[in-house]
Amino acid sequence: MDSQPLVVYCTCLDQATAERIAETMVNERLAACVTVAPGLTSIYRWQGQIQRDAEVLLIIKTRSAVYPLLEARIHDLHPYEVPEIIALPIQAGSATYLNWIADNTGASA
């Protein structure tokens, strides 16, 4: 593998937005897989007020080599002024799965 595998978390306001972003990430090879997890509640401070919103979580499997493009593309597609985009390195995992992530992100073979 030529770069670190990552899991990226991104929350969305609804299922349709989440699926649109997920499909774009996979179609553009910025992610090998995106899990769309509905039914979350986020509690946060925004403009001095405590907010509580239903959200949908994207769990994006990708590589550090394409992360800058993935982050920029999420900003292009996401309706939030400050979308949650958090990338975490995958420290260990199934070698076959990690190789699959590498094979399905970046330039097509």
Question: Where are the model-predicted features located?
Answer:
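Positively charged, small/polar-rich N-terminal and surface patches that mediate targeting and assembly
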Residues: 1-109
